[in-house]
């Protein structure tokens, strides 16, 4: 350290000692003041003052200030469509704008509030009515309140004694969701995301087919094969890897031109599997595929599974919410025949992330698969019904409560409120589809989208009237990401894009936020034209 630094450090120590003597003389808290002196002495080797530990009142004010920030910047801010969906910065730019480094000494609360402001400044606002980038979004006030309560209480939902209200709300929500699926004697659990729900179901299938493997393991088993469609979520293959079956043994079933699994192709693969001496174990059918929003033919798939003794799982993470609507529940016709079903409430239902459920047709499945004797945690002589110690039947021990926020939302809205949300999202998607049909600069990827995924191309003037050959689609594939980047940088709109199979890159709109309206759908198309007409 140079002389100037030493003198500065000495001055700080001197000031700290004076403050210490004066404070003791006034009879204030000795321990806190002593801590302040220790921190001041440390400053001799640092470039700036290290703050003392904030008082309880100061910490309370910090929480209040941050909460007010949340209300102003997000809850109220996203109601104004002039608020940018995102103030996009690259990783390199963010490193220049924000100090991400962690240090030995803490920061002053004013600095922390400034950092919190920057989190709002540079985050994508998924609650904005013009956020269409992924299959989550919206901002539900009751869900946010439930999340806040959950974090403040900070309970672990494995036993009733430490999380009584949380476990009771979880049981209530699960029982209600089971009714919508049609599982009259089922059970379920909340999971950390839809991929985990799909994983748990695949693991349950093995234990259903080979219950002895709970203790003996998979050694000596024949080759186990799972199946999924070309449009299934990638977790179907990842879970095959994680469970030791291998991606080579996750067989992909062909889809029709609407993105639906072809049952005849599924059965062909099942017969081939058997001919090879392997065991057809598990199939993932999808309710609302990620890209095209397609619903597989569940009744036909269920018949094949029953015939060949295959566990049928429905990944309804995205499309399960159609069950909430009398008008659209037919999309899920036959899902009650499946052995398990995944449903993400943080998608169409707009619960705050994360809020995922997996449901099983047969009660007792989870206990048979996962329960162990854990006397330090799951005793049988407690002063309440230990069936509410849900952790005994799960793979996880530490588990956050994801049920309270959804329970509060359901209490506030009722079934009818969620039905209106789904119907509004469907109305928006159908309006957008009709506008695309009417405007010559747009073209639908599939003629009749059945859910709220609306896949389409924008055809700029430079490609109008040209032959749709390989070069045409190559140019089209490069134009769409450019338009997306322009909108992202201006902050006006976030919408995804993707290719699928042999279909070249297109825009993939996923509509779920019920605060969006027909004007927002028009804005999407107008904004794309505005940013792409010169390409």
Each language-model region and where it sits:
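N-terminal mitochondrial targeting presequence
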Residues: 1-44
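N-terminal entrance/gating region of PLP-dependent enzymes' catalytic architecture
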Residues: 45-185, 485-495, 510-516, 523-528
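Short loop-beta-helix segment that forms the pyridoxal 5′-phosphate
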Residues: 177-203, 251-254
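Short beta-strand
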Residues: 190, 443-449, 495-500
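Conserved PLP-enzyme active-site core in the AAT-like
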Residues: 197-367
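Active-site C-terminal subdomain of aminotransferase-like
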Residues: 289, 308, 333-440, 461-462
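Conserved PLP-binding catalytic core of the aspartate aminotransferase-like
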Residues: 444-487
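PLP-dependent enzyme catalytic core of the Aspartate aminotransferase-like
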Residues: 466-470, 499-535
């Amino acid at each position: 350290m140079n002389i100037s630094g030493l003198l500065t450090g000495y001055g700080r120590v001197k000031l700290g000692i004076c403050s210490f003597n004066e404070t003791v003389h006034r009879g204030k808290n000795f321990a806190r003041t002593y801590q302040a002196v220790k921190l001041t002495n440390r400053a001799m080797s640092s470039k700036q003052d290290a703050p003392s530990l904030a008082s309880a009142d100061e910490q309370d004010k910090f929480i209040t200030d941050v909460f007010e920030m949340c209300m102003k910047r997000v809850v109220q801010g996203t109601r104004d469509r002039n608020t940018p969906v995102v103030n996009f910065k690259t990783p390199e730019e963010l490193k220049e704008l924000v100090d991400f480094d962690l240090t030995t000494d803490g920061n002053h609360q004013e600095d922390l509030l400034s950092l919190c402001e920057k989190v709002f400044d540079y985050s994508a606002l998924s609650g904005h009515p013009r956020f269409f980038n992924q299959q989550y979004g919206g901002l539900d006030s009751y869900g946010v309140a439930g999340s806040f309560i959950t974090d403040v209480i900070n309970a672990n939902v494995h036993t009733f004694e430490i999380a009584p209200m949380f476990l009771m709300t979880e049981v209530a929500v699960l029982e209600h969701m089971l009714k919508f699926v049609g599982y009259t004697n089922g059970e379920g659990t909340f999971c950390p995301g839809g991929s985990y729900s799909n994983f748990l179901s695949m693991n349950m299938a093995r234990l259903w087919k080979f219950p002895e493997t709970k203790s003996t393991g998979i050694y000596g088993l024949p080759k186990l094969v799972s199946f999924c469609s070309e449009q299934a979520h990638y977790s179907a293959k990842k879970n095959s890897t994680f469970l030791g079956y291998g991606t080579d043994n996750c067989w992909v079933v062909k889809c029709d031109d609407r993105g639906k699994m072809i049952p005849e192709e599924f059965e062909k693969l099942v017969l081939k599997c058997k001919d090879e001496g392997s065991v057809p174990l598990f199939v993932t059918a999808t309710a609302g595929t990620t890209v095209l929003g397609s619903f597989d033919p569940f009744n036909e798939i269920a018949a094949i599974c029953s015939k060949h003794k295959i566990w049928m799982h429905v990944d309804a993470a995205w499309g399960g919410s159609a069950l909430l609507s009398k008008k659209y529940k037919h999309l899920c016709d036959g899902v009650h025949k499946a052995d398990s079903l995944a449903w993400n409430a943080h998608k169409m239902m707009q619960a705050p992330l994360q809020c995922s459920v997996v449901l099983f047709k047969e009660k007792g499945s989870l206990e048979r698969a996962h329960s162990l004797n854990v006397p330090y945690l799951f005793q049988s002589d407690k002063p309440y019904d230990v069936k509410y110690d849900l952790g005994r039947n799960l793979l996880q021990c530490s588990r956050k409560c994801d049920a309270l926020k959804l329970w509060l939302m359901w209490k506030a809205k009722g079934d009818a409120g969620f039905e209106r949300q789904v119907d509004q999202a469907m109305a928006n998607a159908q309006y957008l589809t009709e506008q695309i049909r009417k405007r010559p600069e747009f073209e639908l990827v599939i003629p009749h989208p059945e859910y709220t995924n609306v896949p389409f191309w924008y055809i700029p003037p430079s490609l109008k009237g040209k032959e749709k050959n390989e070069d045409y689609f190559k140019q089209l594939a490069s134009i769409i990401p450019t338009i997306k980047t322009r909108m992202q940088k201006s902050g006006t709109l976030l919408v995804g894009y993707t290719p699928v199979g042999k279909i070249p890159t297109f825009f993939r709109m996923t509509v779920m936020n019920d605060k969006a309206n027909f004007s927002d759908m028009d804005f999407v198309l107008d904004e794309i034209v505005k940013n792409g007409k010169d390409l």
